[in-house]
Amino acid sequence: MLLFYCWNHINMTDKLFAEVAGAPEDPILGVGQQYKADPRAEKVNLSVGVYQTEEGKIPVLRAVREAETRLYNAAAPHGYGQISGNPALGAFVQELLFGKDSEVVRSRRACTVQSLGGTGAIKLAADLLHFVVGKTKAATSVPTWGNHNAIFKQAGFDVSHYQYYNKADGTIAFEQLLADLRAKEAGTVVILHACCHNPTGLDFTADQWKEVLQIVIDRGLVPLLDIAYQGFDRGLEEDAFSIRLFAESGISFLVSSSFSKSFSLYGERVGGLTVVCQNADEAARVLSQVKQ
């Protein structure tokens, strides 16, 4: 009887979550749920960026299957890993981004931490830039991947935008984009799509990238290059052009990498945040903060 009384009393007085409002459904994943609920056979799921066969199955790449086999045969123990993730992954990420013989790699002036996909890398970048470096303003392209805006706002940034797409003719609104970037306050974090711009698919030419880089330098902006589709445009090396251009300039910047698409490892959440600094000592100190 006492237990029954206590239970009823708690039910009547515990209002901890009573006023919590329901959040809107994710616009992309929500479409996927609608697709599954649709009984019609003549339907195509264009919501989430996942490569599937005609039967709706995700194929396993031969390289991924071979890697899985090697790991299984090695019977590696399931102990705790490093806070920064698998160091071998970090080394390969840097090689993929900058090239094996890059000055950035040789000088060790960049640090890489493993992340929960590209989303996790962007979250780590936003937290580092806001809570450690003290940045408060960020700018994303119009349009952009929705999580760019959401993550930076959640981290405490005042998020503005720069025009990217010209709806009238389906091209990059490059002159407007340059004007918008020039108008940004010094220290603004600018999120740039390194290749395969999401969602337009339109990328800068090499000369346009050089113009953007010059404005970043002149205005004292902080670039975060997001690369989620390396190899999907012109090739692994070619798609890293913008990142290597920024590295050669000598400025400090950040790169968020995702391998969800590259290896069809959507659910494994494989990604990394790379921070390019001025020297190895600086990179070590930055890494110590990201690991917090």
Give the ranges of each region predicted by the language model:
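Short, Lys/Arg-enriched N-terminal segments with co-localized hydrophobic residues
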Residues: M1-N11
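N-terminal "arm"/small-domain region of PLP-dependent enzymes with the aminotransferase-like
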Residues: T13-G85, F92-E95, G99
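Hydrophobic/aromatic beta-strand patches that form the interior of the parallel beta-sheet core
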Residues: V44-L46, A139, S160, L224, ...
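Conserved core segment of the aminotransferase class I/II
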Residues: E248-Q292
